Amino acid sequence: MKPKPSQFKNLERMLGLKTEQLDAVKVTIELKDKILIIENPTVIKMIAQGQEIYSVIGEAKEAQKEEPKVEIKDEDVKFVMEQTGKGEQEVKEALQKANGDIAKAILLLTGQET
């Protein structure tokens, strides 16, 4: 048995809820290790006791989260090579792992940081 829209309106009024259907095109939810993307969702905004609640209905597709690429400067590579005696590729990898932090890259290359 399907509830009637008027029953929902009565329930909303009794509970003090205000609802609004939003004209959403896409919803993206970013998690620690992945991204959920819901295309053409049904999104309902509810306000209850001053709090906003969003209900999202639709089929989610998973996407991999991309790590931000760190731009490594040539002068940083040269400096770290001079300080550690390591090769260019090894220094670039250490700088990437250290998110461009020169001091941390040197520590990684000299075995002082894990």
From Swiss-Prot:
NAC-A/B domain location: 5-69
Presence of the UniProt keyword Protein transport in the record: yes
Known role: Contacts the emerging nascent chain on the ribosome.
Gene Ontology molecular function, alphabetical: RNA binding
Organism of derivation: Sulfurisphaera tokodaii (strain DSM 16993 / JCM 10545 / NBRC 100140 / 7) (Sulfolobus tokodaii)
Protein name: Nascent polypeptide-associated complex protein
Family listed: Belongs to the NAC-alpha family.
Keywords from the UniProt entry: Protein transport, RNA-binding, Transport
Highest taxon of the lineage: Archaea
Gene Ontology BP terms: protein transport
Complex and partners: Homodimer. Interacts with the ribosome. Binds ribosomal RNA.
Keyword Protein transport appears in the UniProt entry: yes
CDD domains membership: UBA_AeNAC
